[in-house]
Structures are given as C-alpha cells and as structure tokens.
Amino acid sequence: MELILVRHPQPDVEPGVCYGSSNIPAAATALSEGHALLAAELAPALASGFRLYSSPLRRCTALASLLGDFTPDARLAEMNFGAWELRPWSGIPHEEVDAWAADLLDFRPGGGETVREVACRVQSFLDELRHDAVVVCHAGTMRLMAAIAAGEPLQQSAAKPNHIKYCEILRLSWPAKSV
C-alpha cells in the first residue's frame, strides 16, 4: 500500500510555543495557501481511490475537509505534552527538557505522553490500514510512521531534529517492501 503523509498548515500560534496535542486552528492564510499547494498534487491519488484520513486536531481537519471526505482518527494526533502545552519552550525548565533528552522514549514531557506511547498508537493505525491512503497529520506522527515503515529504531528516530515543513508531503510504502 502507498501512504501519502501530509503535514498540517502552520498553526495559529506564536513561534516558540509548545503546542503538541492542543487543538489550535491553522492560520487562515497558511490554510488557503496550503490547500492551493496540495490540492493539485493530491488530486490524482484521491481520485484513484486513496482514502483520506486526518488527525482530529483542527489544524489538520481544516485542510482535510478542503481535500475531500475524510475519516478522523485520534491515533494520528500529535504527542500530548501535558503541562508543557501552550507554554513557550523558553519557559519550560531546562532540567525537564534535559530529562526528556536523556530518556527520549519513556519520559513524559509535562506529564503527557511518552514517545513510545505515541508510536504504539501510530503502529495501531498502520496495522489496521488495508488500502492506499492520504493522511493529514503532524510532524511527530509522520516521523514515527516513517521510522516504523523503515524499520528504524524509535530511539534513533526520536533523536533526529524535525525537518518536516508545514504542508510537506512524505510518501511511504506500507507494509515496507522487502528487498
């Protein structure tokens, strides 16, 4: 199966704020520009029977609704950062960020989810998938899906900096094709 992962448009939040699972909308201009950029590129896949899924968070569903009929799935949501949500990264105590960096898979940032827990729900979504799909979601979700599809250790994936831009597309095969 082919998976086309799409990161949501830029959210309507100040730069430098931790927003993980907070249900903030996409910025209006970013949404219209993102739709204009993606609609033509995704049209052939959607017209050929790819199913459309979305994280239930507004910054994703707003784009998905412009692309077509979609199925929201909570397993596609971004990581919950607990008490860190909607706080400036600069206001989160350094010792807490350092504790997360020392245990990327099992530390609970702000008392929220662990990376391992997010990976388990993402894996569950992938395991149930039976058809080609376009998935509107988040950079964290996309990175975990890519790691799972590539058979990459989660620790290695979690340690990589995020380079996925807003409205960027990532194409994967699932299950991964054997060589």
Regions found by a protein language model. Name each.
Residues A139-R143, E168-L170:
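GST superfamily/GST-like fold recognition
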